């Protein structure tokens, strides 16, 4: 009985996926690169994390109203990967601190940050969260002058209060920080 694979129909031997320089630099055969895409696992994880941010809202003052407006239909923050505001720190990976943090509330804010799972990021929204805002004056005793004194902040969104568009820009900056590239490039202005 003749083999179903004649000598001309037998597949060519698969070329080695290991380059001559060593196992750390694989060489992809051209016939494979035409039908498949390759990426580093870290890059794929970063892309997934950046496009599915789960924000924990911590609205403390007037900035919280603008943060809520960003989640409504007019601005629709879910188009940018921050789908649903989470009520629990164990379900969130981005903490948006919007408003004034006083020293009595600081331990609770720090505890919420500590309860978030890794990887976790923080967006400081508004001048009060960034630097104490109008409550920062000589001799004040009650206001934390910036949440970066409690934990690291990844993105600062300035304004008093910042508009929902500014928060969306902050989320895009955070995505850029996670993946290393911008999803919606900003047009460069000619001088």
Curated annotation (Swiss-Prot):
One Pfam family per UniProt: Oxidored_q6
Cofactor binding comment, as recorded: Binds 1 [4Fe-4S] cluster.
Cofactor field: [4Fe-4S] cluster
Keywords, comma-separated and alphabetical: 4Fe-4S, Cell inner membrane, Cell membrane, Iron, Iron-sulfur, Membrane, Metal-binding, NAD, Quinone, Translocase, Transport, Ubiquinone
Paired cysteines (S-S): none
Function, as annotated: NDH-1 shuttles electrons from NADH, via FMN and iron-sulfur (Fe-S) centers, to quinones in the respiratory chain. The immediate electron acceptor for the enzyme in this species is believed to be ubiquinone. Couples the redox reaction to proton translocation (for every two electrons transferred, four hydrogen ions are translocated across the cytoplasmic membrane), and thus conserves the redox energy in a proton gradient.
Name recorded for this polypeptide: NADH-quinone oxidoreductase subunit B 2
Species in which this protein is naturally found: Opitutus terrae (strain DSM 11246 / JCM 15787 / PB90-1)
Gene (name only): nuoB2
């Amino acid at each position: 009985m003749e083999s179903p694979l004649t000598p001309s129909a037998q597949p060519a031997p698969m070329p080695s996926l290991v380059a001559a320089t060593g196992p750390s630099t694989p060489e992809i055969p051209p016939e494979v690169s035409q039908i498949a895409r390759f990426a580093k696992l870290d890059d794929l994880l970063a892309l997934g994390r950046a496009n599915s941010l789960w924000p924990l809202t911590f609205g403390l003052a007037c900035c919280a109203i603008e943060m809520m407006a960003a989640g409504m239909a007019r601005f629709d923050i879910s188009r940018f990967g921050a789908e649903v505001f989470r009520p629990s720190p164990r379900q969130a990976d981005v903490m948006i601190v919007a408003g004034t943090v006083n020293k009595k509330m600081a331990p609770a804010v720090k505890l919420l940050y500590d309860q978030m799972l890794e990887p976790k990021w923080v967006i400081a929204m508004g001048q009060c969260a960034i630097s104490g805002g109008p409550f920062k004056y000589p001799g004040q005793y009650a206001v934390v002058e910036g949440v970066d004194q409690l934990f690291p902040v990844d993105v600062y969104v300035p304004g008093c209060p910042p508009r929902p568009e500014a928060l969306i820009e902050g989320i895009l900056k955070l995505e850029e920080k996670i993946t290393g590239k911008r999803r919606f490039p900003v047009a460069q202005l000619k001088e």
